[in-house]
């Protein structure tokens, strides 16, 4: 696999606290990579090391196969969780200032900013001071500033914080569009539904250690609990009776009022030694079977189980 970024055995301590302990990970080029973990796990420390804001005590970070340098940081667009716009400056003036710092000519910066401001519907903000903007409005501006110079690696730390659902969805779509245009995105968040929507791969850090890494779909499949959702038409007693000796019957996946009007549902876990085909055959003999699907755990469930040590 072609990796744009590799971290090898990164460790970092602060005044007796081990923020990162021998963390290694590889980020595939052209992916959205989720960096997950509870508060204080070490995610922000890792991001700061990648951006060369702080240095690791040991280990190395490679960008395109070689040790990352200060000059490489220009290839990175970083949107920190702590937003950092100058409140007294006008929006347009400030956006051009940061674009110039990132190597864009003034004319090119103005041209690209015009396109982004039109895309986000914020043309009227150009001459407004940042202090006049709401948190969500300022966040839109900082997102544009982060991506304007077309960095090959983007790092977003809790990018949806402060956004309403409509603007959060807009930002998700733009992140995926940036990936599709060739950028690699590191995405740090606590929002597991967003992880399922946009992340291709993840690493989960807990108590300074990397405890889980891989492709999102593969991780979800790997940690399934052999639970199946059955939808059927027919007598509930017949459905339960035909599988009672073969399966653990669990609570239905939704309250009865939310079930489809023409189907009933069950959650089943086959007993040890019982094959799925036996369960399907038994159900087919008792009711009209309409669906039989493995229940894949959500990333939220996997996160909780991994952090609690029950995965």
Label the predicted regions:
Residues 2-5, 12-206, 212:
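ABC transporter nucleotide-binding domains
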Residues 8, 26, 231-233:
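Residue-level recognition of well-ordered beta-strand positions that form the cores
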Residues 8-10, 292:
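Generic beta-strand hydrophobic packing signal
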Residues 29, 124, 234, 270-272, ...:
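Non-catalytic surface loops within mature trypsin-like serine protease
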Residues 64, 94, 103, 142, ...:
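A generic structural signal for secondary-structure junctions
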Residues 173-270:
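ABC transporter nucleotide-binding domain
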Residues 271-311:
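C-terminal coupling/interaction segments
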